From Swiss-Prot:
Keyword Lipid biosynthesis: no
NCBIfam families associated with the record: rsmG_gidB
Entry annotated with the keyword Lyase: no
Keywords: Cytoplasm, Methyltransferase, rRNA processing, S-adenosyl-L-methionine, Transferase
Record organism: Azoarcus sp. (strain BH72)
Chain's role: Specifically methylates the N7 position of guanine in position 527 of 16S rRNA.
Subcellular location: Cytoplasm
GO molecular function, one term: rRNA (guanine-N7-)-methyltransferase activity
Name of the protein described by the UniProt record: Ribosomal RNA small subunit methyltransferase G
Major site of localization recorded for this protein: cytoplasm
InterPro entries on file: rRNA_ssu_MeTfrase_G, SAM-dependent_MTases_sf
Binding site for S-adenosyl-L-methionine: G80, L85, V131, E132, R146
Family: Belongs to the methyltransferase superfamily. RNA methyltransferase RsmG family.
Length: 212
């Protein structure tokens, strides 16, 4: 039995609590990704989270909590994605979504490439690059990150990836009013969504930032 299999029920319950309809086979792929993350983490130090139940809550369910707010997004860039979060779970659940995952640390990008191969994620492309140097062939209608400590940095480094009508999606803890006040000119918070992540006893918010 795999390490995460005993927690498959917790994942299923969390998905139901989020109001999401994800097939059992797709949930099994999410578990398989979590297994890979735990396995590679022993050598590569991809995440500080090592407890299987926390992989379910802090990584998988936390990533899936943003799904309802990305329904209009077709091409998504995940910036500073580390072990592929939230990009890989989103790519697993939405196979029609094109996901570009940008990570500066080579070993983390290498893990993402291995996960892409093992999980057969044709819609997921990891890039070992700095986001400010990235020049995609076509703009993204969504750019997401849960890595940036500052909204200002997120906008200044990643804003050039956003196409007309697109937006930046910042996954944060407590709503960062001071960071919102420091946003660069020409950018505004279009919406703030509180995220109730099942099993996670912490405030989470998704801020949608767009030009205007």
């Amino acid at each position: 039995m795999s390490v995460l299999t005993p927690y498959a029920g917790r994942l299923a319950d969390g998905i139901a609590a989020l109001g999401l309809d994800i097939p059992t086979a797709t949930q099994a792929r999410l578990i398989a990704f979590g297994e890979l993350l735990l396995k590679w983490n022993k050598v590569y130090n991809l995440t500080a989270i090592r407890a299987p139940q926390e992989v379910i809550t802090h990584h998988l369910l936390d990533s899936l909590a943003v799904l309802p707010y990305l329904s209009a997004v077709t091409r998504l860039a995940d910036i500073g994605s580390g072990g592929g979060l939230p990009g890989i779970p989103l790519a697993i659940v939405r196979p029609e979504l094109s996901v570009i995952s940008v990570e500066t640390v080579n070993k983390k990008a290498s893990f993402q490439q291995q996960a892409k191969i093992e999980l057969g994620l044709g819609n997921f492309q990891p890039l070992n690059a700095r986001v400010e140097n990235l020049k995609p062939e076509q703009p993204c209608d969504g750019v997401i990150s849960r890595a940036f400590s500052s909204l200002k940095d997120f906008v200044e480094l990643s804003g050039h990836l956003v196409g007309d009508g697109g937006a930046l999606y910042a996954m944060k803890g407590v709503r960062p009013d001071d960071e919102v006040a420091a946003l660069p000119a020409g950018w505004t918070v279009r919406a703030t969504h509180p995220l109730a992540v099942p099993g996670l006893d912490a405030e989470r918010h998704l801020l949608v930032i767009a030009r205007g």
